[in-house]
A protein has these predicted regions:
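A short, flexible loop at the N-terminus of ABC-type nucleotide-binding domains that lies
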Residues: 18-22, 26-39, 89
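Walker A (P-loop) phosphate-binding loop of ABC-type ATPase nucleotide-binding domains
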Residues: 55-59
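Conserved ABC transporter NBD signature motif
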Residues: 76-87, 91-92
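Catalytic Walker B motif of ABC-type/P-loop ATPase nucleotide-binding domains
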Residues: 174-177
């Protein structure tokens, strides 16, 4: 069942505990002089779809790998549902589901075996895992392939089995790194619907993307990062911020071109009047006022 954005916002207000809290996060790779993640801080609330935007090398994937416990970080704190990633990593990870950008799965297993393996790690009961696996496999039209080896899957099918595995324990925080990369429109729509449904039940989705249109359509808020630094967090429920998102993103990444933001509708209207001169129109208006 998919709820309206208003319902999602109501859940945000009702719940007080942040699903994800990042404070002053710093990560530097040993053989690099550049700081990959430079004192980043933000919070993500229950019922929220939160976008994480940036170009390649901006620090998105490094931040996500720190959030998920894959990479150690130099300083700062990460809390998932109140569990500190350094002091209580098991508690933090039990509340999180993760879909990586590289299909890190055991390809010699069948889809069903792999999902059951993940369910065992999270101690999901037989009844719950069966119900969730069947429902998600049906949603993704993947029932026919659940007993085939994953190595025989297409790119989209591998992405779907990763999503099923990430949601098998019904995590409060669902983290996805570039989830729509290489997917066909049908698969993209299915994952979008699932993200909205997950949040409608008071859970949270945190995902990285290059796709500004997708983020504007899907997210309540979005953060823009560049060169390891947090540039800005925008509330995308405010309509004017959807335009600002593009401008801030392109300016932050050094790819801003004012031609991208021309009001072409107004330009076409002017072009349809070859004798139109803005200054002359203003002069004519002043003359009319003095009559």
């Amino acid at each position: 069942m998919v709820y309206s954005r208003a319902r999602v916002r109501a859940i945000n207000i009702k719940e007080k505990i942040s699903m994800l809290t990042v404070k002053d996060l710093v990560k530097k790779y040993p053989k690099s002089e550049r700081i990959a993640v430079n004192h980043i801080s933000f919070e993500v609330q229950p019922g929220e779809i939160f976008g994480f935007l940036g170009q390649n090398g901006a620090g998105k994937s490094t931040t996500i790998k720190c959030l998920t416990g894959i990479l150690p970080y130099d300083s700062g704190t990460i809390e998932i549902c109140g569990h500190d990633m350094k002091n209580d990593p098991i508690g933090a990870k039990m509340n999180m589901g993760y879909v990586p950008d590289n299909h890190s799965v055991y390809e010699k297993l069948t889809g069903r075996e792999y999902v059951n393996y993940v369910a065992d790690l999270y101690k999901v009961s037989e009844q719950d895992r069966t119900e969730r696996m069947n429902r998600l496999a049906d949603l993704f039209r993947l029932e026919f392939a659940m007993d085939r080896q994953i190595k025989s899957y297409s790119h989209g099918m591998k992405q779907k089995i990763c999503v099923i595995a990430a949601l098998i324990h019904n995590p409060k925080l669902w983290v996805l790194d570039e989830p729509m990369m290489g997917l066909d429109p049908q698969s993209t729509a299915e994952i979008i619907a699932l993200m909205r449904e997950h949040c409608a039940h008071g859970n949270t989705v945190f995902f990285s993307s290059h796709n500004l249109d997708l983020v504007k359509k899907l997210c309540q808020r979005a953060a823009i990062v560049n060169n390891g630094e947090l540039i800005e967090i925008l509330d995308l429920t405010v309509e004017e911020n959807k335009t600002r998102l593009e401008e801030i993103f392109f300016k932050a990444t050094g790819t801003y071109d004012e031609r991208l933001f021309i009001d072409y509708a107004a330009q076409e209207s002017a072009d349809a009047r070859p004798d139109y001169v803005p200054e002359q129109e203003q002069k004519d208006e002043k003359e009319e006022e003095t009559k």
